[in-house]
Amino acid sequence: MRTFTDFVSGAPIVRSLQKSTIRKYGYNLAPHMFLLLHVDELSIFSAYQASLPGEKKVDTERLKRDLCPRKPIEIKYFSQICNDMMNKKDRLGDVLHVCCPS
């Protein structure tokens, strides 16, 4: 008797769904995830740090409110920002271009 796992090409349904979700949405989701994971490394985002004594934490609600309604980020600009963040050379103009309204 065939099980549901056998029915889904021999792979567990969750793994199959994860792969298809990554293929479909990964391209658009990756820049946003990278920015959220490394936001505290950008000098421009010091305004988004929550005021907690002794802790370096990002005010995610305020950040989400400011970033979510924006247009999709163009990868060619964003890849340079990611590279600059990793090299600790964030450029204010590019970050503002991506994250702030025109």
From Swiss-Prot:
The text of the family note is:
Belongs to the helicase family. Yeast subtelomeric Y' repeat subfamily.
State the source organism's domain of life: Eukaryota
Task: Show the InterPro entries listed in the entry.
Answer: Y'_ATP-dependent_helicase
Name of the protein described by the UniProt record: Putative uncharacterized protein YPR203W
